[in-house]
């Protein structure tokens, strides 16, 4: 019976599973069926055999792989194609043209099949509804059109432009790789916030382009020509502008007929070219060239302001917003993808658990089946018998074997095993010992040191030494590897990642040695293999915890970055192929000119050029060539710039910033990882200790019989844990892990408080000063008081500033110049002052021995150093001593003394110091990588960068004597020149020079030039051969990706994260997040804005007109039209065209003047000029008038003047400076008015100003840095001769302070900073200025540390402070838009002024509802919010209510902020308020107590609040509605109880007209009425209470009756209190009225045993269901019942 049951149950379970399985597939199939339309192309149904066939093919994986393979093959075909100039071709290209037809057929077939399968366009899942399919279809159609056209029209039609679209096919590979889609999705999601920024960038570009057009139009067309021959002056192979700044030499004149710089591309002649030039400047490439050209033409008085402001605003601020948005979006996208993955895993886990449960059920059911007991007994007996027989046989065999075999071998084997185990144990102990660890580290560094000694022209003995030491180190590291393998066993050894890495390095090194000695491999391959040795350097990371953590996080990043690199590669391939199609073979301009190295003539070269543009280095030069290739500016060529701009924006701004986004994201992960590890570390070490002890015990007890687990497994466990927790050295604990930003940073506030100036000033340190002055000594007390007097401090600060300014005023050329002598006298005075201050402080605080002594503070030591340096330089005032020169330079550290005297500045400096400490590990890893690449570079390129000035000579031995040189390729101008054998400025002849070269490459400056020098490099002592080793480009690309894209971005990311964390430290103990703090700060500090409303009827009408939205829009449109007319100007425009533009300008000026007059009439003087925008408008109108008048006068003067050409020219020159160059700006400034229009732009502008407010100390630090470096630059490099063709010339030098600052600003933007560094270094071609007192050696070795340190400080640290601030303030662009932020709150102030025009700071509580309904969420309720819902929200807001029915501005704004951000709104409201008050006092210490009482209520029960008032109103409203519904039901059989209830309700509702008017405030009517603009204040509570008191008396018997009949409890409470009011009628005051109302509400709430002030609790009480005579009546819910007021 049981046997029969069991299979049935089992079958049932299996049948269930079978039943469920097809359902799932069916459902999936169903989904797919849904995607298919019933008919495709109006005729093919789902049962059509052709369509079924197409669906099968399209859905198969094989087809998908085939198409991807075809795309890849198509890419290869496009890459093999070689473009030739002038339409030439070769056999390969012709073959490829034929193959193109095959590809076209395949892609067309795919397209047709998919259209048949999916339908064309009408259905939701149809073919063209998918973006990738649309792209395919577009490419196929273009391909067919281009093929048809090329066959039909044989000549005169170029289809190349159409064919170029083929290169978009590789984009389809993205749809095949999921990891690519995460990166691409995050970029696409970022497009919406990026669009906001794009508009801002466009706005900045347009403004600067129009200013440039007005100021510099036609200025760059003058150049020097010979007076007689008419030849251009071009000593330096390129022409430059002449004019005020650059005077032509004798024999030459300045003529106005030059096309302009870069073949006329770089100029401001029309709006288009002006925009292109501005965009180029914002990308920081070639902006100094444009500036210097303008300065040559117009002088250098003010032009730099235009360019410097453009760079700061455009490049540093606006462009960094892109970075902020991308990093925000990427982390959001990553989190989404991670959550999606986690959810998927959870679902899979649930599915597995479900299946497991099914199986368990099946198993348990199977266990229930009892087998036949008799059969079981028989089976057992049979088994036992078999076992018995076998064991007897075995015993007999064993006895025989023991007798035959001697046991000696076995005992020996055991003995040897025991010894082996002991040796292994000893080896393992040795391998894990401190000594072994330090020995290996020492060997690694020695090996590294030996590798670093390699250099060009090294002696033979060094070669041999390196060879032998290499063999020695290989042997040692091999021994280490074998020892570890033996002690840990193979499995134990290879389980560690570092050991696998070691093994790889050792095997690589051995194979390299074998290949080198047998000469089987080419030298290039060997030199790369040799560098595998360098990876040993990373063995350090195994033992250094913080480093190993960083390396681990970097390895994690590589997974994310692999997909980005794939996308980057795809991007480069597509643009490379497109470049080949468009520009291939076109970069040949003149026969005598050499073709530019960056071109698109082959696929390989095209990839290199695109990669160069991607890095941004000299992208503008390639663009100029592209424009010239199509005929230049004066033809179709200018369109070519679109390709380069799109490539630059997508590549440089978007893709490369995603690198940074990934870096920051992974660093955050590493941070959390480190914290967890740190917590677990002690536990792991404890476990280790226990395991080791247990293992030893087991060994001692069991002797020979140690289990496999004890020998192998425990070792493995222990080893793994040792690997993890690093119990190697106690010193390691002193190092924090990578993520220890918080630990390190957290020490800062403590340090800050310890060094707080005020606390130091309080007491004299205990102990004697200089063993003379005790702490009670009067003289010491006097000194202490004097030092700490505020006036004394201010005086010293002024002295510091003046003495610093004098350092900047010195003449660097002549030390004995009269100006310097005067300044030196002042210097003596300031040094005396500083010495006196120092002595006073030393007496006051003591020198060094006791706590609080002067020298115990780092900042005081800085003071001491500066004063000592000044004293030494005065006493040894002889210029002969070079040490004194250096000491005089050190005086420039004086401004740093100001840091100790300005708290904010000190905080920023400490923040930077913390950042530098935190970044130490990253710097170390970067240096290790840099060092590795430098050694590889030395292997590859040492001694190979030499060249002869005569290109025909390849070797040094041939490079002697003279050669003929044709100037500008003109055969009529031969010149004799000496041959010179020169090394390149940057080379790899030794490791130090290689690291310098690589550092410049990592800054992206000048690397393409270096790349082509490397490609042409031949062999040691050999000259260049064109394209000799193209493969070496891989070295630079790998270096740039690893170091510049990845490591530098991680570095920058870490700086940003550290600065942001540092900012948070101040508030780490308060419970508010950053957004909540910002919003509360805004609410506390905000003030209402005055809104003037005239009383005179005519003036009111004018006011109403100018404040209306239609007037605003019309002005907006006029500004837009004005912008268009300003942009219509161009160089050499006809006379009549200029007159039209002038007339239009007059019209616009008249219109804007009318606007000014109307507004002045409406607002009067005081109110008009009270608004900053109005003042700005007035200045513009005034400036425009002056501009018109001035221009007209000058035009008439020129027309009337009957003079010779020379004096006319003079008149023109005089007029341009003021008229055009200044007053024309007022026309452009009208554009800025656009910023006041539009909420989005207003928000951006507000955040921008806020960013600037957050930057004063950062800006001060930058100013100080620039000042110090500029003065050092003047002192050290000021004597270098200004020479044309070098980087130190008339525009770029250190001879004056402003010039030095400009050079530094240029270096900070990275504009060829390495060229300036080389021009200041000690080289033979660096000459001294003839006016200086120096004869030679004007270059200095200080140039290298000077420029490198400045670049690192500026580009990596200081500029990133800007980025950190911007990312902090603009995070709302990527944040969820529904979260309230400070940027929303400006709208509240603006709309409040409509209800409170006099800015009294209070409005009627009734107006608050309409105000908040006007404001969109998240700040307000929005127009769609039902009126009653708005009242409910007001209950939760609960601001204090004044006796006249008004609420206060700050209280309302605070409540508006507090509710959406849920700032202390949970739990008991009184406790929450108390906590919030304490928090506000803690963070904003200077908050006015009265203001605090207004915004956060005290726990006083007697306070009347909006919450209590609207609670009362809502209770009434609910009852009114309840009664109305009951009346409508029209029940006739109402009992007396029902009548009583109605009476109670009527009592409430119809108390008096005054009650209805004041308490309900006609709220129902108000909901439908138009929002009132302004209201008059009137009293409220007097009327409420008098109306209550005038009502008829309610007897207590009535109340008792009501309570007996189970009526609504809080209604009874209300009525009881009504009686109480009647009894105390005579003694009630307005104050007690307030109290009684409040008590009523509180009593009614106490029914449920809780006192509420929050919306949720209020709603709980309201929804109480009253019972009446056994029937249950549910109060109506406004959400469900009130349909007319729904959202």
Curated annotation (Swiss-Prot):
Q: Which residues are glycosylated?
A: 90
Q: Where are the III repeats?
A: 777-1059
- Segments in the Extracellular topological domain: 81-99, 146-157, 217-302, 455-467, 516-525, 584-639, 810-826, 878-885, 942-1030, 1130-1143, 1192-1219, 1278-1343
Q: How does it sit in the membrane?
A: Multi-pass membrane protein
Renumbered to this chain, the Polar residues biased-composition regions fall at 9-23
Where is the secretion signal located?
none
Q: What does this protein do?
A: Voltage-sensitive calcium channels (VSCC) mediate the entry of calcium ions into excitable cells and are also involved in a variety of calcium-dependent processes, including muscle contraction, hormone or neurotransmitter release, gene expression, cell motility, cell division and cell death. MDL-alpha1 encodes a dihydropyridine- and diltiazem-sensitive current in larval body wall muscle.
Domains as described in the record: Each of the four internal repeats contains five hydrophobic transmembrane segments (S1, S2, S3, S5, S6) and one positively charged transmembrane segment (S4). S4 segments probably represent the voltage-sensor and are characterized by a series of positively charged amino acids at every third position.
Name-wise, this protein is Muscle calcium channel subunit alpha-1
The organism encoding this protein is Musca domestica
